[in-house]
Amino acid sequence: MTLLFPLIASEGGFGINLNLFETNLINLVIVIGVLYWFLKGFLGGMLERRRETILKDLQDAEKRLKTATIELSKAQEELSAAQQKAEKIRLDGQARAEAIRADGEKRTIQAMAALKQDALADLTAEGARLTEQLRREAALSAIDKALAELPNRLDSKAQAKLIDSSISNLEDV
C-alpha cells in the first residue's frame, strides 16, 4: 500500500493533501452543500411557517388598526355631540339664570313699589287720623269752652228758646 500512495500522488490521483487551507475550504463547501441539501426542506418549511405567521399577524394588526380607526372616529363624533350638548346646556343655563335675574329684579321693583304705596297709604292714613284727632280736640275744646261760657250767657229765656229750636230741628229731620 505504501507503493500505491506515492504512485497515485505522483500521478495526480487520490492522495493525502496536507495543505490545511485547501482541505478546510473543500470540507466547508462539502458540509454547506450537505446541510443545504438535507436542511432545505426543514429550514424552508420553518421559514415559510414563520413568514405565514408574520403575514397573518400583519393582517390582524391592519384589521385592528381599521377597527381602532373606526372606533376613534365614532368616539370623536360622540365627543363632538357631547360637547355640543354641553354647550347647549350651558347656554340654556345662562338664559335661565338671566331670566331668573330679570324676574328677581322685576319682583324687587314691584316689592319696592308696593312698599312705597304702603308707606304713602300709611302716611295718608296717619294724616287723616291726625286731622280727625285735631278736629275732635278742636270740637271738644270748643264744646268745653261753649259749655263753660254758656251758663253765663244763657238765661232761662234764651235756654228755652234754644231747646225749642233744637226740638223743631229734630222734627224736621
From Swiss-Prot:
The keyword Transport applies. Pfam families: ATP-synt_B. HAMAP family: ATP_synth_b_bprime. One of its GO terms (cellular component) is proton-transporting ATP synthase complex. F-type ATPases have 2 components, F(1) - the catalytic core - and F(0) - the membrane proton channel. F(1) has five subunits: alpha(3), beta(3), gamma(1), delta(1), epsilon(1). F(0) has four main subunits: a(1), b(1), b'(1) and c(10-14). The alpha and beta chains form an alternating ring which encloses part of the gamma chain. F(1) is attached to F(0) by a central stalk formed by the gamma and epsilon chains, while a peripheral stalk is formed by the delta, b and b' chains. The chain crosses the membrane at residues 25-45. GO terms for molecular function: proton-transporting ATP synthase activity, rotational mechanism. It comes from Synechococcus sp. (strain CC9311). F(1)F(0) ATP synthase produces ATP from ADP in the presence of a proton or sodium gradient. F-type ATPases consist of two structural domains, F(1) containing the extramembraneous catalytic core and F(0) containing the membrane proton channel, linked together by a central stalk and a peripheral stalk. During catalysis, ATP synthesis in the catalytic domain of F(1) is coupled via a rotary mechanism of the central stalk subunits to proton translocation. Component of the F(0) channel, it forms part of the peripheral stalk, linking F(1) to F(0). Keywords: ATP synthesis, CF(0), Hydrogen ion transport, Ion transport, Membrane, Thylakoid, Transmembrane, Transmembrane helix, Transport. This is ATP synthase subunit b. It is found in: Cellular thylakoid membrane. InterPro entries: ATP_synth_b/b'su_bac/chlpt. Belongs to the ATPase B chain family. It is a single-pass membrane protein.
